[in-house]
Regions:
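Accessory C-terminal segments flanking Radical SAM cores
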Residues: 141-218
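Conserved C-terminal portion of the radical SAM core fold
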Residues: 9-15, 37-41, 64-68, 86-148, ...
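Short C-terminal domain-edge/linker segments immediately following a structured domain
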Residues: 45-47, 71-74, 96-104, 137-140, ...
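Canonical radical SAM enzyme core domain
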Residues: 1, 19-61, 71-77, 81, ...
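A short, N-terminal amphipathic alpha-helix
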Residues: 2-9
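Generic detector of well-ordered alpha-helical segments enriched in charged/polar residues
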Residues: 58, 76, 80, 119-123, ...
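A broadly tuned preference for mixed-charge, low-complexity surface segments
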Residues: 68-76, 91-100, 124, 156-166, ...
């Protein structure tokens, strides 16, 4: 239903995230529905590319699909600290499997602003994997969920990326468990939902411009 309405709502691309999307045993069917119409990206930790899920992944149409795989560092230390012991080796194996299987892969790291050396080592690993710059994403830590530090997010400070969950519509997927970022309960009709978010975003920008120009000194 979401994909059907997105066709007429000026949607340009679809991202599927979680949790872990590959825990859905029928994800391949959902992906094939989405990729027929939109460029589609799945955000995954690549840790469950085994058994039946691996077989189903191999049957997914590679056209219009990107697997965005989380890898926070070039060695297990930091990544495993974030995501659990042994997760680095599984993620790296998943990245290599996806590349070898002909999928477009983007690798994403969540790092603090002071992660200079870690970031350099991470980029070196991406070089070894022959990933281009547009196949690499570095996101800063947001003060959301279990994080006790990081960038503070609000609807006024964050460019919206409409996020639909079973609980409702959120301003952005990075804050999809934050009550203050929840826009409304129902996503349908999607075109109206997107219009509501655009209108609020415009108001935030107008207010920001007014504040920015309130004290001219030159």
């Amino acid at each position: 239903k979401i994909i059907d309405q997105a066709k007429n709502s000026n949607v340009k691309e679809v991202f599927i995230t979680g949790g872990e999307p590959f825990m859905l045993i029928d994800l391949d069917e959902r992906l094939n529905l989405s990729t027929k119409i939109f460029p589609t990206t799945v955000l995954t930790n690549a840790m469950v590319f085994t058994g039946e899920r691996r077989r189903r992944l191999e049957n997914v149409d590679r056209n219009n699909l990107t697997l965005q795989i989380s890898l926070d560092s070039a060695t297990p230390d930091l990544h495993d600290l974030h995501r659990g012991q042994g997760s680095f080796d599984k993620a790296l194996a998943g990245i290599k499997f996806a590349i070898e299987s002909g999928f477009r892969v983007r690798v994403a790291a969540t790092l603090g602003e002071d992660a200079g050396e870690t970031e350099s080592e991470w980029n070196a690993l991406c070089d070894d994997l022959k990933l281009e710059q547009d196949q690499r994403v570095i996101r800063r830590i947001a003060k959301q969920g279990y994080a006790n530090a990081g960038l503070v997010m609000s609807r006024a400070s964050l460019i919206p990326e409409v996020c639909i969950t079973k609980e409702g519509v959120y301003w952005h997927p990075v804050a999809a468990i934050d009550p203050s970022m929840k826009v409304q309960n129902d996503w349908s009709p999607l075109a109206e939902t997107i219009s509501t978010i655009k209108d609020e975003y415009r108001q935030h920008r107008i207010k920001g411009d007014v504040l920015a120009s309130a004290f001219p000194c030159a």
